[in-house]
């Protein structure tokens, strides 16, 4: 009963010239218009209906249609805020002419910092074609580090870059420091420092990288055939099994194995070409190559078709 009486007490909006005429509501403009004479009899009408929008690129949701913006559970306010529009009447302003209902707080400084970091993470990921699950894991890692305040003095961009590196390794699609450095504004050394600090702060770890983690991508970027890729993979694995490359990074061993396999085939690649793709210096490739060269006959797969015999391979 109370609800009915309240509704009945509300003033009825009608056209002064045509009280019985139907009113047409313009949802976009927020106007009530007389259907007889076109007079606007009410303005600033609130549309209480749902504002359904379709986001075709929103891969995270099964249904791309939703009301309003996507909720971000990583933010303290859930990324849902209300903006109060400025009034037009004198009652909407104080004696100094300022709006009485200013939006004092639309987003906290911490949420704003995280939003900026999330945008940077997405931009970096897009530039090296990383999937959504990597972005989500990176965002979660950044949130944990940010809330712990354990890396004070380090820039958010550096922390975000290191989190992206960690997320890639945890998801089984590792990227090199140089690859992350290339899509960020942070030096390789600074990313490496943040990487170690984050692992310590979160008391987490990452799987050790192997030569196989990079071989397919490096060979593909170099335009090498499957035969050369399989040979390089076999060479690198045998070199590790025979303990020919103690202390050498898997990336440098992979680069040296690719160099050896390509030089034995008709698809020869220079040290510089391989170094540019792998993100290692020519001298680093040479050092690893010299360690595996003496055992070259034992490293190639039995069915490899040589274009250049083993004894004719570069000795460097």
Curated annotation (Swiss-Prot):
One of its GO terms (cellular component) is transcription preinitiation complex. InterPro entries: Cyclin-like_dom, Cyclin-like_sf, TFIIB, TFIIB_CS, TFIIB_cyclin, Znf_TFIIB. One of its GO terms (molecular function) is RNA polymerase II general transcription initiation factor activity. It is found in: Nucleus; Chromosome. Sequence repeats lie at residues 124-200, 218-294. It catalyses: L-lysyl-[protein] + acetyl-CoA = N(6)-acetyl-L-lysyl-[protein] + CoA + H(+). The zinc-binding domain is necessary for the interaction and recruitment of RNA polymerase II to the core promoter, the formation of a fully competent pre-initiation complex (PIC) assembly and basal transcription initiation. The C-terminus is necessary and sufficient for interaction with the TATA box-bound TBP complex and for the formation of PIC. This is Transcription initiation factor IIB. It comes from Xenopus laevis.
């Amino acid at each position: 009963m109370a609800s009915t009486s309240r509704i009945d007490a509300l003033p009825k909006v009608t056209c002064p010239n045509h009280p019985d005429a139907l009113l047409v509501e313009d949802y976009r403009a927020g106007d009530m218009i007389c259907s007889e004479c076109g007079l606007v009899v009410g303005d600033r009408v609130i549309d209480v209906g749902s504002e359904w929008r379709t986001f075709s690129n929103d891969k995270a949701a099964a249904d791309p249609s939703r009301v309003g913006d996507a909720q971000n559970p990583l933010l303290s306010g859930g990324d849902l805020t209300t903006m109060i529009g400025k009034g037009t009447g004198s009652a909407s302003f104080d004696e100094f002419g300022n709006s009485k209902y200013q939006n004092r707080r639309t987003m906290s400084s911490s949420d704003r910092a995280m939003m900026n970091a999330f945008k940077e993470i997405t931009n970096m990921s897009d530039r090296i074609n990383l999937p959504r699950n990597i972005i989500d894991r990176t965002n979660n890692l950044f949130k944990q580090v940010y809330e712990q305040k354990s890396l004070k003095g380090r820039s958010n961009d550096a922390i975000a870059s290191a989190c992206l590196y960690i997320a890639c390794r945890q998801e089984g699609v590792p990227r090199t420091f140089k690859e992350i450095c290339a899509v960020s504004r942070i030096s390789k050394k600074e990313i490496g420092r943040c990487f170690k600090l984050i692992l310590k702060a979160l008391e987490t770890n990452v799987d050790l990288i192997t030569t196989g983690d990079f071989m397919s991508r490096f060979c593909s970027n170099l335009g090498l055939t499957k035969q050369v890729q399989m040979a390089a993979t076999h060479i690198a694995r045998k070199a590790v099994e025979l303990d020919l490359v103690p202390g050498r990074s898997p990336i440098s061993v992979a680069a040296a194995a690719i160099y050896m396999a390509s030089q034995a085939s008709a698809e020869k690649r220079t040290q510089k070409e391989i170094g540019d793709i792998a993100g290692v210096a020519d001298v680093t490739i040479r050092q690893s190559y010299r360690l595996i060269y003496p055992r070259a006959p034992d490293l190639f797969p039995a069915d490899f078709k040589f274009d250049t015999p083993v004894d004719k391979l570069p000795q460097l």
